[in-house]
Amino acid sequence: MSQAELLSPSPVAPSFPPLSYQGVPVLTTEMLAQAYEVEQHQIRQNFKNNRERFTEGKHFFQISGNDLREFKNCVENFYSVQFGKRTPSLTLWTERGAARHAKMLNSDRAWDVFELLEETFFRVVRSDP
């Protein structure tokens, strides 16, 4: 059984596919960067420079191997999201991880977007199978 789940679409952030991992709504690094209007490398650099402030399973999930393969297959079958074929791992950000990034970016845009994500994307209701 895959740990990836599809959720019902967010009414305010329809451009982001509603993704879930281990029952937790998540965003990819690309999605988070797009929302905050920064480059992906800025998200990665903030994470690298503040790694001790992030806890895996609480702020993010780092998936690889079979988990990554299952997640990619599930997402790519339902959405136009594409992942690199040779991507060895993928970081998925939880609501708490997205909040940490908003704090580090410390821009009005980041805080406004986080509030929107908090009220919509991270509050989606699971679809019944």
What is each of the regions a protein language model found here?
Residues 1-129:
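An anion-engaging/catalytic patch
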